[in-house]
């Protein structure tokens, strides 16, 4: 009998996942459907369950705060997600998230194990039969200081910052280490009051509680200081190589607990959970800013401070995370490491880890859906393994094209193009390469959308990487900051010739910013960042036949087996999901071409 499990995550990066007998049918973020960046509350995504099944065996909910404490509907006493699932007929009306024993419920609330869900997502997609998971995240599950009163407010709460778990099949996850951060102070706190009910039963090897910002919250504080939104840490990462060491800054991270752990210096970084922490500008007057002007218009001193502080937080944070990786291996003896949580999207840090881990023969898997959307995957897979006890080791997730399978017809393509005043003509790879080498931007739209924040050839903007001013040109068209780097997609068989892969066989998820091999940078200047690195995606014919063939054609003409690749969106917008999203983006920008390789068609917008 087929088992259907639907899972949702409710916070920012909200999304939904559907499993059929343990395999992903689709995984989608709410923002792709609503067109609102970082949208939460995945009500639109939930309705998509009905496209595949009229009934769920389980609806699993992930977040950072239990359903019982949030999202309540007046009068009914229930939550909006259970209510919607009942309204759609996906679950039985007699069921309740608040009735019966945990194992008998149809609605399963896993919001109390946020970090464990990040770990489960990474472990089940790593290909390892056992592993140790490190989760480095902003603010995970909210846990009240006093379990008896259960008060949920900023004075009584702590939040997960960094966690270590041992992982094994079918559902063997043990919490070994956890750093809980908060605003404090916390007088007279008993350690056994802090973990969630489920995790307290497991016991801990080590639990840290303090009133400081965690690794990610400190990074977010610097991100905010640099003029960005706290969730835009990727911009800080891109800005960091423009900075340099600066002796006038204090260290961001310092010893805590008599040197037993490292934490953000609360004199420099002030925690403001559950929001981002803030840089203490009043204590360090030379850091004070007078306005929130863009990085292109602020005074020279502030610009230098932002660049140098970005450099500092990147360097220091990756050193701290590396220490935690070694701590995880030391605690378990397991040299299979999986990394997840928001920090795992830091491709500069991920590459930094490889050098040190290779010396100790430690294998690293970095989960490509490490944002909170990944907790829905973790929740669904954990529920599947808990109910079936399936011990079969899952294979490495080489591809993450996990969106919907749209069934467009030629008439659909023509109708959508006509609505925006665009034309549709026949096209093949040779013609697309001619456009690219003539310094045209060409977008590509095909198949299922990519899961996670990286475009991997199904929803991508493409350009010629050999064009010297390509980075500035495309950043201007996408309306992005000048310092934002771009990625490259390369034929796997040539990857080691062009980049130092640090022993990796492939990099299909674009999770590492790699050093170029000698003499390479000048050949592909558009995708080489100021520090000489490039975030790359390796491509095989088996992973993406159409995209591979296009890169192969580009290689034949240019002797460069790489295409400039960036996400198909404009600044501040989500990745395009539907063909209409794609054509609308052309209409609202200076881009003119969208290639549909499955149909051999090219949509052209005369802008």
Where do the model's predicted regions map?
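Phosphate/ATP-binding catalytic cores across multiple sugar-kinase/actin-like superfamilies
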Residues: 311-335
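Glycine-rich phosphate-binding loop signature in dinucleotide/nucleotide-binding domains
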Residues: 53-54, 128, 328-333, 438
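A general "terminal functional-core" signal
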Residues: 316, 344-346
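Conserved active-site "lid/cap" helical segment
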Residues: 14-15, 20-105, 243-312, 324
């Amino acid at each position: 009998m087929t088992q259907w499990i639907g899972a949702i995550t409710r916070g920012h990066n909200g999304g939904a996942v559907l499993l059929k007998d343990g395999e992903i049918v689709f995984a989608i973020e709410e923002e792709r459907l609503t067109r609102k960046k970082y949208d939460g509350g995945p009500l639109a995504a939930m309705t998509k369950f009905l496209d595949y099944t009229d009934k769920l065996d389980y609806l699993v909910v992930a977040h950072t705060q239990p359903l019982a404490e949030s999202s309540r509907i007046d009068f009914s006493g229930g939550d909006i997600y259970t209510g919607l699932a009942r309204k759609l007929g996906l679950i039985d009306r007699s069921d309740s998230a608040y009735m019966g024993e945990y194992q008998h419920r149809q609605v399963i609330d896993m919001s109390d194990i946020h970090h464990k869900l990040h770990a489960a997502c990474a472990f089940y997609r790593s290909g390892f039969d056992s592993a140790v998971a490190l989760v480095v995240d902003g603010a995970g599950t909210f846990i009240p200081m006093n379990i008896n009163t259960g008060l949920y407010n900023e004075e009584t709460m702590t939040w997960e910052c960094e966690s270590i778990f041992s992982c094994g099949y079918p559902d063997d996850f043990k919490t070994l280490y956890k750093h809980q951060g908060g605003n404090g102070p916390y007088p007279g706190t008993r350690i056994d009051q802090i973990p969630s009910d489920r995790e307290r039963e497991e016991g801990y090897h080590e639990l840290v509680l303090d009133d400081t910002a965690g690794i990610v919250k400190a990074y977010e504080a610097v991100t905010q200081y640099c003029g960005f939104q706290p969730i835009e840490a990727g911009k800080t990462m891109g800005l960091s190589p423009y900075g340099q060491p600066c002796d006038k800054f204090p260290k961001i991270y310092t010893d805590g607990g008599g040197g037993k752990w490292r934490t953000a210096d609360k004199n420099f970084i002030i925690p403001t959970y559950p929001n981002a922490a803030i840089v203490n500008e009043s204590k360090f007057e030379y850091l004070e800013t007078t306005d929130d002007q863009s990085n292109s218009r602020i005074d020279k001193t502030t610009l230098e401070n932002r660049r140098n502080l970005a450099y500092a937080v990147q360097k220091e944070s990756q050193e701290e995370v590396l220490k935690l990786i070694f701590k995880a291996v030391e605690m378990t003896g397991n040299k299979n490491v999986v990394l997840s949580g928001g920090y795992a999207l830091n491709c500069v840090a991920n590459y930094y880890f490889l050098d040190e881990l290779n010396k100790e023969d430690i294998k690293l898997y970095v989960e490509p859906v490490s944002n909170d959307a990944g907790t829905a995957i973790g929740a669904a897979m954990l529920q599947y393994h808990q109910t079936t006890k399936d011990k079969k080791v899952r294979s490495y997730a080489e591809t993450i094209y996990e969106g919907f399978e749209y069934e467009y017809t030629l008439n659909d393509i023509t109708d959508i193009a006509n609505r925006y005043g665009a034309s549709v003509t026949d096209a093949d790879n040779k013609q697309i390469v001619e456009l690219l080498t003539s310094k045209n931007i060409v977008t590509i739209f095909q198949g299922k959308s990519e899961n996670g924040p990286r475009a991997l050839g199904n929803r991508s903007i493409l350009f010629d990487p050999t064009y010297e001013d390509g980075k500035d040109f495309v950043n201007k068209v996408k309306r992005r900051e000048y310092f934002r780097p771009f990625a490259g997609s390369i034929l796997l068989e040539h990857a080691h010739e062009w980049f130092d892969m640090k022993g990796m066989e492939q990099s299909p998820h674009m999770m590492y910013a790699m050093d170029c091999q000698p003499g390479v940078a000048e050949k592909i200047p558009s995708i080489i960042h100021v520090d000489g690195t490039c975030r790359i995606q390796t491509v095989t014919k088996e992973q993406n036949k159409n995209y591979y063939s296009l890169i192969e054609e580009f290689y034949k003409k240019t002797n460069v087996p790489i295409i400039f690749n960036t996400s198909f969106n404009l600044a501040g917008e989500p990745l395009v999901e539907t063909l209409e999203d794609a054509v609308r983006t052309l209409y609202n920008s200076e881009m003119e071409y969208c290639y549909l390789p499955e149909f051999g068609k090219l949509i052209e917008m005369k802008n």
